[in-house]
């Protein structure tokens, strides 16, 4: 199989105040023509550094210390800067992780796409615009003639990513590189982008590299997969090899950690113990030895050689695969699979558990024009972010709240805590109506309800130490306590070493910052924690650690959780009941297991079907939901989902369905649909 890009012996170092950082070591990767290659691994494994190195875009303190990167017959590492200008953008194009920061906010797409084509002197401005419009149409952007004149902030997240793909395709590149192309997207938009990449590959016979920590995305898209750990390639093979016959313990561990593969939600998620090693001082022997459940003495002293398996292109670096070792019988006996935690279960709360929180007909409205403009225009303009939301939370229960961006999930969570003022409705906690409480009474009640914010680093003051951050609630509520003692207690609860108390947020990893957020939320021993995207941006193993910690704290302290997320595998694993929101309204509410196995609302069905599975044989053939979420300022008449629903009828277009009770498999459920997909009143 001919390779478009062949990387051999690539080594990259970064100079830091602590000495050289050995980021990439002896990297060998082949990207076959017309194929999609995936690169996976935890944060810090070197995935993105490979991409920046072959594009010669390393930071000023980075250096390539050896190796070659042969692309279409020329070594990219031997080219000078002027020669590389004709490669970047023209022969190799990038789709970046965050289109909002990679696109220029003060330039229209017309201007940005014209600038990208600056080397095509033979094209007039009109020709460049027409070409850009054709590409925008190709990637599924509606009305490209009009939308090319708009700015990035006028586009939704999914449309911005489509525009980013259009920009990458403008110069007909030989190689398209997508760096975490769906990380910030909802499951429905993720499905659309995956479908688009598949179409581009089929139509243009494109060669694509995908960098991601999303195993479902890799299984859905890729032909070949490279697994990286701490700057080394530990396994390489076909997507079937990697998902069905993983040879390296690290690959096995990554797969076991994925909640989408853990069907029994009452189990604690498997995790990979320990942390990625410090690349300033490399350990002797196997780079993964310190975290491996199948480690041998040989692993600690000798680096493993690459072993080709079954005479195929499946290659892994592990002593366990050494034929000589297997023949001598020195391999470990009865070693549990990497990351296995079988037997650990989380009990499900009884349906008779005390109802701790009750939300009734809650509405939240935001003014969209400024106070001055509203006076000039004689009337303010409003959008309804949450409409008539009603739900309950029992003692010791986990309630999942899901929906696309803009559905009102976070606004509802903040309104429950009183962080956002509700227009109408009620929030009753432990028999007390929050609206009836004085400021002092509300402050007292807030000790029993805490919030974990979506961005753990952004929500922590960069000027405060961990000790100050996790003990601040005592000072806010004027509670006399030994702060040193409380800080030590909270660190122990969330398993943070005591020496972390003197660190600042920028010195923490994503998982460590998340633990600080959990500790801060637990400071005053609340009964309810509202967790907004508690695993967003985390690797699957770190994600498992945070979820296991939350489960353990729930068992120990009887906590109730309202978990807001668009990560459906996570929600399926942790939630007892589930609420689905669309355009500010609840459209389905009931038992989590039942909803995931038999969704009643078409929107819920589309969300569940849209989750990419870490199984190459379960690739989707259709996009789960077409179209964009309507604007809150211009809601559709009737059922608000009818503009995207494949089951919509005239009734759906004219009448809004109320949230009504149905019965499915003997359990009550609420659904807002004229024709529920399941249930006694609408069984299909």
Which residue stretches match the model-derived regions?
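Conserved ABC ATPase signature
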Residues: 150-155, 159, 504-508, 512
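P-loop NTP-binding/switch modules centered on Walker-like glycine-rich loops
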Residues: 42, 56, 181, 185-267, ...
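ABC ATPase NBD coupling module
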Residues: 76-93, 119, 241-246, 277-283, ...
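Conserved ABC ATPase "signature" region
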Residues: 75, 127-146, 255, 482-499, ...
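A short, proline-enriched helix->beta-strand linker immediately N-terminal to the Walker B motif
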Residues: 170-174, 523-527
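Conserved ABC transporter NBD signature motif
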Residues: 63-75, 425-433, 445
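Charged, flexible cofactor/metal-binding loops and thiol motifs
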Residues: 238-356, 368-377, 592-684
């Amino acid at each position: 199989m001919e390779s478009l890009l062949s990387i051999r012996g690539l080594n990259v170092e970064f100079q830091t105040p602590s000495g050289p950082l050995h980021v990439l070591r002896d990297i060998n990767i082949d990207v076959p023509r017309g194929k999609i290659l995936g690169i996976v691994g935890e944060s810090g494994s070197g995935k993105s550094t490979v991409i920046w190195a072959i594009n010669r875009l390393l930071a000023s303190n980075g250096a390539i210390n050896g190796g070659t990167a042969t692309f279409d017959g020329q070594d990219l590492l031997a080219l000078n800067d002027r020669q590389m200008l004709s490669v970047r953008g023209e022969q190799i194009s990038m789709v970046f992780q965050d289109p909002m920061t990679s696109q220029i906010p003060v330039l229209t797409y017309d201007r940005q796409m014209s600038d990208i084509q600056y080397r095509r002197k033979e094209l007039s401005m009109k020709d460049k615009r027409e070409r850009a419009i054709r590409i925008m149409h190709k990637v599924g952007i509606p009305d490209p003639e009009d939308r090319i004149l708009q700015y990035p902030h006028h586009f939704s997240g999914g449309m911005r990513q489509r525009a980013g793909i259009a920009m990458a395709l403008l110069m007909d590149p030989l190689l398209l590189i997508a760096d975490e192309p769906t990380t910030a997207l909802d499951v429905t938009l993720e499905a659309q982008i995956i479908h688009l990449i598949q179409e581009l590959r089929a139509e243009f016979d494109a060669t694509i590299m995908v960098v991601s920590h999303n195993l479902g995305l890799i299984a859905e898209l890729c032909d070949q997969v490279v697994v990286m750990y701490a700057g080394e390639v530990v396994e390489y093979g076909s997507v079937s090899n990697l998902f069905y016959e993983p040879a390296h313990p690290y690959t096995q561990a990554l797969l076991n950690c994925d909640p989408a593969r853990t069907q029994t939600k009452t189990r604690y998620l498997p995790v990979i113990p320990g942390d990625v090693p410090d690349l300033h001082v490399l350990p002797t022997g196997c780079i993964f030895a310190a975290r491996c459940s199948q480690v041998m003495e040989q692993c600690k002293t000798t680096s493993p050689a690459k072993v080709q398996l079954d005479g195929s292109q499946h290659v892994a670096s592990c002593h366990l695969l050494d034929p000589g070792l297997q023949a001598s019988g020195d391999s470990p006996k009865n070693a549990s699979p990497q990351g296995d935690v079988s037997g650990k279960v989380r009990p499900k709360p009884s349906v008779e558990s005390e109802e701790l929180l009750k939300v009734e007909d809650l509405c939240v409205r935001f003014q969209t024009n400024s106070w001055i403009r509203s006076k000039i225009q004689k009337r303010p303009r409003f959008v309804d972010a949450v409409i008539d939301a009603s739900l309950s939370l029992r003692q010791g229960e986990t309630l999942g709240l899901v929906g696309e961006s803009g559905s009102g999930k976070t606004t509802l969570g903040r309104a429950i805590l009183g962080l956002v003022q509700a227009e109408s409705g009620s929030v009753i906690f432990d028999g007390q109506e929050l609206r009836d409480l004085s400021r002092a009474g509300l402050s007292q009640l807030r000790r029993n309800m805490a919030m974990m914010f979506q961005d753990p680093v952004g929500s922590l003051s960069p000027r405060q130490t961990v000790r100050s951050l996790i003990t601040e609630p005592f000072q806010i509520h004027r509670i006399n306590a030994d702060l040193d003692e409380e800080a030590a207690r909270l660190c122990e609860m969330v398993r943070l070493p005591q020496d972390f108390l003197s660190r600042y947020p920028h010195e923490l990893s994503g998982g460590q910052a998340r633990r600080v957020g959990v500790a801060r939320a637990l400071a005053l021993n609340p009964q309810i924690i509202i967790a907004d995207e508690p695993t967003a941006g985390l690797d699957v193993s770190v994600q498992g650690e945070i979820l296991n910690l939350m489960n353990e704290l729930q068992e120990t302290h009887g906590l109730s959780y309202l978990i807001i997320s668009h990560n459906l595998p996570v929600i399926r694993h942790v939630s007892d009941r589930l609420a689905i929101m669309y355009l500010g309204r609840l459209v389905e509410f009931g038992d989590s297991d039942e909803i995931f196995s038999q969704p009643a609302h078409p929107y819920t069905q589309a969300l569940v079907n849209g989750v990419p599975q870490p199984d190459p044989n379960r690739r989707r053939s259709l996009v789960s939901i077409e179209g964009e979420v309507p604007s809150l300022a211009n809601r559709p008449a009737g059922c608000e989902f009818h503009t995207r629903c494949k089951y919509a009828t005239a009734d759906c277009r004219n009448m809004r369905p109320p949230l009504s009770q149905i019965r499915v498999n003997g359990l009550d459920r609420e659904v807002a649909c004229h024709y529920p997909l399941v249930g006694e009143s609408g069984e299909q």
